[in-house]
Amino acid sequence: MVCFYLFYGLNIIEKSKEIYGLTKYFFYICNVKLKKLKAMKVDNFDLIKKHINTSGEGEFYMLQIMRRSKDQKENGGKRKQTVIKSYFISSPEYLDSKRDEIVGLCEMFNARAYINLNKKSYKQVSLKALEILAGKIAHEDYNIKTLFESAAGQTGACDGNKSWLVDIDTKDMDVVEKWKSIINDAAPVGDKIIDIFPTLHGYHLISKPFNKQILCFGSQLEQIDVHNNNPTILYVNLKDSENDNESE
């Protein structure tokens, strides 16, 4: 009888261990999924709004809602990138007035909102559009549906206050701080970091232009990409966790 109870007790203990292990694994999986869901959303409206400033009606910031190739596959598996809508942001108030619409379109199309913090002028962009148009006509290309947007993308900061985008693909703040230090030590020496915005899997440093040769001193760190006229992420809330392999 003693052996029976001993065997029965050991069996219960083993079952309890099994249940505990399964429960622990279940909560681990739930935690991983929850972290992934949290990582799929970025809302930088309030951070970016303070950088929107124009001195006249002829100036704007280019904002586009885009479905990026890594967020969907269409046409038999071929990757495609689509611009859902473009906005010409003239003030922080105008950005605020469009916030719900922008968020709604991003949610509806599983898309991302990007904004270029190099301020544009309608005059400069219009002149660039004429230049592009002349080239298209010369080559008998009459597809001009995105002419103005293309011209805006090829036009720099209208006020001379250029900003660069440094894309760091890690959430490790020690790495981010080291890159900030390297950039500030680059010529011209001084504080060049304008702001830092979170992305899905890292950060965008917005900086003043610097000598890129100093980047070799960060070769042992997480690699970065430097862009002199690229947009930063304004809003994204991806629905599909398969798309979390991100590089903005």
Residue ranges and their predicted role:
Residues 10-12, 28-29:
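Short, positively charged and aromatic/hydrophobic N-terminal segments
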Residues 206-208:
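Short hydrophobic/aromatic beta-strand micro-patches
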Residues 217-225:
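C-terminal, non-catalytic extensions of nucleic-acid polymerases
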Residues 25:
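Cationic, low-complexity basic patches in intrinsically disordered or flexible, solvent-exposed regions
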